[in-house]
Design a protein with these regions (language model features):
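A glycine-centric feature that highlights glycine-enriched low-complexity/repetitive segments
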Residues: 1-490
């Protein structure tokens, strides 16, 4: 934990010189990259496609959307990796560290097998947990030195990357580890890798675009909602959305070969449940959204953008509060109020122009009542149902206990180290504020994990039309599964 606190302080010092100018006033919007430059490098002969959490083997329906199409030249292979994350993928699933460790072995073997073919070159497509695995593989290749593949033989396309240097959830809280969950905050994807890399992030994706200032509780909640409503949508993107991606700025003198892109999200994910309310849901959401946008975006440092506008290649941990002038916030809220009222009024006018239709109500017939009584459950069915409810409640309770244990045992030590480090540096405000910010941010993540602890069968990575096979295992969640040997497609 001392190392974690020291890492935090070092990272804060590294970006301190750029933070002042970028937060004092709203930053200029980065310009969209030219379509021909997305991705900024040609695909290699073979593309290895790795699925997100919950989808260990991507089905054919996942292999056609716009981002994927831009990373394929000749051969495309979906590769199996565990992609489990206790408790999000079930109470008997693998913990993150074990799943990542197994996936890293498979990814490394797959790359080396493909590159053993003379003249072959590989593009790795990673999404969510497989983006973590790809990031760790970059670190591994760096450690291999001359034995690693050459830069011309390998490149990466990553989406929904939890290790984004300046937005990923696993980089916001440096070197934090939750032993009770066997979950490591791995840090940042290497920005100095020799392998050309393109990283795409959807705005408000809570895993890949987490709030920079977690004391902003509303921004944290919006990011957590984005795990469900945004992180799952990468394969639903249209070509126009991908081509309109905004290339994020990198630090002066940056000579790396990684490009970072943000794709804007139209609606705040925190309002998606309200929009699901019939008739009045959308008008109310449109009334609230402009001002909510200002509040949420302040969690990233600028009321105009739902992502950090500072350098994308610099590992940026959480901070205390953005240095945005109060007048800028007041003006943005005033404009948001006016915009919300106009949108709400327009929605009501559109509703009033639609013909009013009332549902037809049919009273039950005597025969229907008799049939309902006959279909009533038997005592045995009632007992079995109660047993299933008890079993289900136990399954729900177990992750809650594990998460609570992780926070109770680890968070106090982490925040204490932050307090001591900042106090030793003579910064009393940060000594009090940083532990509080960490507690608010991690507590909100905890609440979100409980809410999405049992994702649909389609997987946490994607919940719409692309459904992958469910990975079944009889292994305990801390036990490493049998090693899967990668075999190239013939």
């Amino acid at each position: 934990m001392a190392a974690a606190a020291n890492s935090y302080a070092d990272a804060e010092a590294a970006i301190a010189s750029t933070r002042q100018n970028q937060l004092a006033v709203p930053a200029a919007a980065p310009t969209p990259a030219a379509a021909a430059m997305i991705p900024p490098f040609p695909a290699n002969l073979t593309t290895l496609f790795f699925g997100p959490t919950g989808i260990p083997l991507p089905p054919p329906s996942m292999l056609t959307p716009p981002i994927r199409c831009r990373s394929v030249r000749r051969a495309l292979q979906a590769v199996f990796t565990p992609e489990e994350l206790y408790p999000l993928t079930g109470v008997r699933s693998l913990v993150l560290n074990t799943s990542v460790e197994e996936g890293l072995t498979i990814l490394h073997d797959a790359i080396m097998v493909e590159l053993a073919t003379t003249g072959n070159a590989v593009t790795v497509f990673g999404w969510s947990q497989s983006a973590i695995i790809a990031s760790l593989e970059m670190q591994r290749f760096t450690a291999m030195g001359g034995a690693a593949p050459s830069a011309s033989d390998l490149n990466f396309v990553l989406v929904g990357n939890e290790m984004n240097p300046n937005s990923g959830m696993l980089a916001r809280f440096p070197d934090l580890t939750l032993p009770a969950l066997d979950l490591t905050f791995y840090g940042a994807t290497p920005s100095d890798t020799i392998y050309p890399t393109a990283i795409y992030t959807l705005e408000y994706d809570g895993f890949a675009d987490f709030s920079r200032y977690p004391l902003n509780f509303i921004s944290d909640l919006n990011a957590v909602a984005g795990i469900t409503f945004v992180h799952t949508k990468y394969l639903d993107l249209t070509p126009a959305q991908v081509e309109g991606a905004t290339k994020l700025p990198t630090s002066p003198g940056y000579t790396g070969v990684t490009d970072y892109y943000i794709i804007r999200t139209e609606n705040r994910p925190l309002l998606q449940p309200l929009r699901a309310v019939p008739v009045i849901g959308d008008p109310l959401a449109d009334l609230i959204q402009p001002n909510l946008k200002v509040i949420v975006n302040l969690g990233y440092g600028d009321p105009n953008y739902g992502y950090s506008t500072s350098y994308a290649d610099v590992r940026t941990p959480f901070g205390l509060w953005p240095n945005v002038p109060p007048q800028v916030i007041a003006d943005a809220l005033a404009a948001g109020t006016q915009e919300g009222i106009l949108d709400f009024t327009a929605d009501l006018q559109a509703l009033s122009a639609q013909p009013l239709t009332l549902p037809q109500i049919q009273l039950p017939q005597p025969a229907d009542l008799v049939a309902a009584v006959a279909a009533a459950p038997t005592p045995a069915e009632v007992v079995n149902t109660l047993a299933r409810i008890i079993s289900t409640n136990y399954a729900v309770l177990l992750p809650t206990v594990d998460i609570a244990l992780a926070l109770v045992t680890t968070l106090p030590l982490y925040t204490t180290q932050l307090f001591v480090r900042q106090l030793a540096a003579g910064n009393l405000i940060n000594a009090i504020g940083y532990p509080l910010a960490a507690t608010v941010g991690l507590g909100t993540i905890d609440s979100g994990r409980r809410g999405i602890a049992h994702p649909p069968r389609g997987g946490l990575g994607h919940r719409s039309k692309h459904r992958g096979p469910r990975h079944l295992t009889d292994s305990r969640r801390h036990r490493r599964p049998p090693t899967t040997v990668y075999r190239p497609r013939q």
